[in-house]
Design a protein with these regions (language model features):
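Nucleotide-activated donor-binding/catalytic signature segment of Leloir-type glycosyltransferases, i.e.
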Residues: 22-42
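Aromatic "clamp/platform" in nucleotide-sugar-dependent glycosyltransferases that forms part
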Residues: 62
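Short alpha-helical segment that forms part of, or immediately flanks, the ligand-binding pocket
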Residues: 48, 67-75, 89-90
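Short, small-residue-biased leader/transition segments that mark boundaries at the very start
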Residues: 1-4
Length: 164
């Protein structure tokens, strides 16, 4: 899957991993390295600056259950695109992000990501819609809201308890 409007894209990659060198080589061979900033590991203050300038947070991992970066992105109003599995399924909804079904083959997964990115580039107004939805959804993950929810749940359970 190719991304068609490449001139509209810039990719910021924060962090390092086992595939970094392979990905950098791929970017050079496919003449897209000029569209990528390879940040590596960043101090938190610098990583926050990258988040604040982003239009989309993309997680391509299929091994992480529910990374905290989703909530960090939400706190900055940045929607997340992720594979639809584990905790991502419960955290990301159509209002605050894009869930991509996991396919049987790697190539199908890559193609699905490219298709979703192309849809966004064809309809850039969707970035704003997702950002607004992300701000709404983020409210439910604030500690104060979680505390309120858990307290009401406990009170509900305790009120139903029989005392002998």
């Amino acid at each position: 899957g190719d991304v068609y409007k490449r001139q509209l894209l810039h990719l910021d990659i924060v962090g390092d991993g086992m595939l970094k060198e392979k990905l950098q080589q791929y970017a050079i061979e496919h003449d897209i390295n000029n569209m990528i900033t390879w940040h590596g590991q960043l101090p938190r203050v610098e990583a926050v600056k990258v988040f604040n300038s982003a239009h989309l947070h993309v997680i391509t991992s299929v091994s992480e259950g529910n990374p905290t970066t989703i909530w960090e992105a939400m706190s900055y109003g940045v929607p997340t695109m992720s594979f639809d599995h584990c905790g991502m399924h419960d955290t990301i909804c159509d209002r605050c992000g894009i869930r991509i079904p996991i396919a049987k083959h790697y190539e199908e997964c890559v193609s699905a990501v490219a298709i979703e990115i192309n849809k966004l580039l064809e309809h850039p107004e969707r970035f704003q819609q997702l950002a607004e939805g992300t701000i709404e959804c983020a409210y439910h993950y604030k500690w104060s809201e979680r505390e309120r929810f858990l307290n009401s749940l406990y009170e509900s359970l305790l009120s139903k308890k029989k005392v002998y």
